[in-house]
């Protein structure tokens, strides 16, 4: 029960943070969605150890676990645009598949590059 309440508080904190980032974007007229700005700011706060991972970890893990649930309204909403899907459906699916493939390949290559650099660093520090 304690973990549930802690997770609920963390989800509320993340929600408030997201709303705050949307407000910042609106007030400052920034051409970046509030959610993207929020991700960047959360990453920076975690990276520079201004906030601790434990402060948001349980809530973030729950949100990730339930991510599919958040796409259901979007998928249902698409059904209102059957005429557009009939005309551009194949193109949309092709773009989604290609962009997914590009993201997967680039993520894999970047991960391998980072792993190699870490291994080189580890080897260099153990040789010294």
Swiss-Prot record:
* Predominant cellular place of this UniProt entry's protein: membrane
Subcellular localization(s) per the UniProt record:
Cell membrane
**Membrane-spanning residues:** 23-43, 58-78, 84-104
Q: Which UniProt keywords apply?
A: Cell membrane, Cytolysis, Membrane, Transmembrane, Transmembrane helix
Pfam families on file:
LrgA (PF03788)
Q: InterPro entries in the record, alphabetically? A: Holin-like_CidA, LrgA/CidA
Topology relative to the lipid bilayer, per the entry, is:
Multi-pass membrane protein
Taken from the UniProt record, the cysteine pairs bridged by disulfide bonds within this chain are none
Q: Does the keyword Acetylation apply?
A: no
Q: Does the keyword Membrane apply?
A: yes
What biological-process terms (Gene Ontology) are attached? Answer: cytolysis; killing of cells of another organism; programmed cell death
Gene Ontology, cellular component aspect: plasma membrane
Database matches in PANTHER family: HOLIN-LIKE PROTEIN CIDA (PTHR33931:SF2), HOLIN-LIKE PROTEIN CIDA-RELATED (PTHR33931)
NCBIfam families (alphabetical)? PRK01658.1 (NF002460)
Q: Which family does it belong to?
A: Belongs to the CidA/LrgA family. CidA subfamily.
Show the HAMAP family listed in the entry: CidA
Q: What does this protein do?
A: Increases the activity of extracellular murein hydrolases possibly by mediating their export via hole formation. Inhibited by the antiholin-like proteins LrgAB. In an unstressed cell, the LrgAB products probably inhibit the function of the CidA protein. When a cell is stressed by the addition of antibiotics or by other factors in the environment, CidA possibly oligomerizes within the bacterial cell membrane, creating lesions that disrupt the proton motive force, which in turn results in loss of cell viability.
In its UniProt entry, what is this protein called? Holin-like protein CidA
Organism name: Bacillus licheniformis (strain ATCC 14580 / DSM 13 / JCM 2505 / CCUG 7422 / NBRC 12200 / NCIMB 9375 / NCTC 10341 / NRRL NRS-1264 / Gibson 46)
